[in-house]
Amino acid sequence: MPPAGDDESPAATGDGYSKKVLQGRYELGRVLGQGASSKVYRARDARTGAHVAVKAIRKQQQPHHHPSCRSPEAAAAARRCVEVEREVAALRRVRGHPHVVALLDVLATRSTVYLVLELASGGSVLSALDSRGGGHYDEPAARRLFAQLASAVAHAHSLGVFHRDIKPENLLLDERGDLRLTDFGLSAFADADQHLGATDGLAATHCGSPAYVAPEILLKRRYDASKADVWSCGVVLFVLTAGYLPFNDGNLMAMYRKICAAKFRCPKWCSQELRSLIGRMLDPEPDTRIKIGEIFDHPWLQQDGSSSSFGMIQAASSHSKPEVEKWEAELEQAMELNAFDIIGFASGCDLSGLIGPLPDRVRFVLPGGDSKSVLDKVEKLGREEGLVVRRKEEEWCGGVHVEATSGKFTAYVRVNLLPKKILMIEAERVIGSEIPKFWHQLQIGNLLVRK
């Protein structure tokens, strides 16, 4: 492995990876990015061949001194240790969400901590914007990315994790262009007083990047970290759709004054719905600022930004396109069952065992069923429970995607019309640390209704 604290990239072989292996497992390759005390390498898991990212953070151990006599270097080293602890704790707590980068492993030497992370090979959103020559995303593309960001932030908040440094540099893209929220080193925890610095749920620590920081932080007030994250998300949304910062000035104090006054102007190409959402997020008063859970109900996010069969359902959900295609292929396989196979099953019969055991997934056959009634019932119950519901119907199939605003539950229900007016109904739970009432109803077949 590279020498502890070595600032140079490891010598790479012809395939781009180092001959030396980090702790017998990870072959380090080129540097993907670096900060004042850390570097991120592209790496390969020697055991599995999987490509990963390794974040190397120098600890720079300092001699022990009385806290009042610590040098600036020692204080910086102590801060880095706290940030590493926070990042690891936060990533472990929010693991499993499709739009949060996954922590795979943690390694350490006397001088360096290595975080092995899911590789997002598409680079950062900032790099993507720069590659457009200072351009911006159109609204459908921005809506897709922003929905993924909002889902990740809502998920983190529901688990008591507040990021506090949301900016394009910390938003990565995978090979499909889906977003991953990363770098939780400045995060705060709702249930840990030592992180919030208070016992009333209000943060006291002032952190984050100046252009993305909420006014209440600049004014050195105690603040609600969840509302500060919403402000940062609003700045990100502006940058995605405008291509530049809403508050920018060569003079830092002048920029701070603009932020505190919320003085900004959307470009002329922004729709009224987009202007409305940005305005709600960049509200200088935290008490009236839109909440993360309310964002999903805003008209701008409710628009269908895609012409594909499931459009926004695919764009904002946990399913990537390959997963959706696999799912549809499995349904096509199920449709190949002949009429004799199908008609022998009673109404509401669970086909999971016939097609193959799949975790968190149930399939039913309903002879003589009505697809609209099934979808109506799923949609009604989902909305009654406060879930975000999106529905799409075609001649021979229909589907409903439901998602909790907390990010703790995501599911699909899809109905396919088979020969002889038989319905094939499949429900799949993608994320499920919360189990809404309607999911229990689905499992026992209570939503399978006839005309």
UniProtKB/Swiss-Prot annotation:
Active site positions, chain numbering: 165
For this protein, the record's PROSITE patterns field holds:
NAF, PROTEIN_KINASE_ATP, PROTEIN_KINASE_DOM, PROTEIN_KINASE_ST
Q: Where is the Protein kinase domain?
A: 26-301
One GO molecular-function entry: ATP binding
Annotated ATP binding sites: 32-40, 55
Residue spans crossing the bilayer: none
Q: Region labeled PPI — which residues?
A: 361-389
Please report which protein family the annotation says this sequence is part of: Belongs to the protein kinase superfamily. CAMK Ser/Thr protein kinase family. SNF1 subfamily.
> Could you give the domain comment from the record?
The activation loop within the kinase domain is the target of phosphorylation/activation by upstream protein kinases. The PPI motif mediates the interaction with the ABI (abscisic acid-insensitive) phosphatases.
Descriptive protein name: CBL-interacting protein kinase 22
Species of origin: Oryza sativa subsp. japonica (Rice)
Q: Which gene encodes it?
A: CIPK22
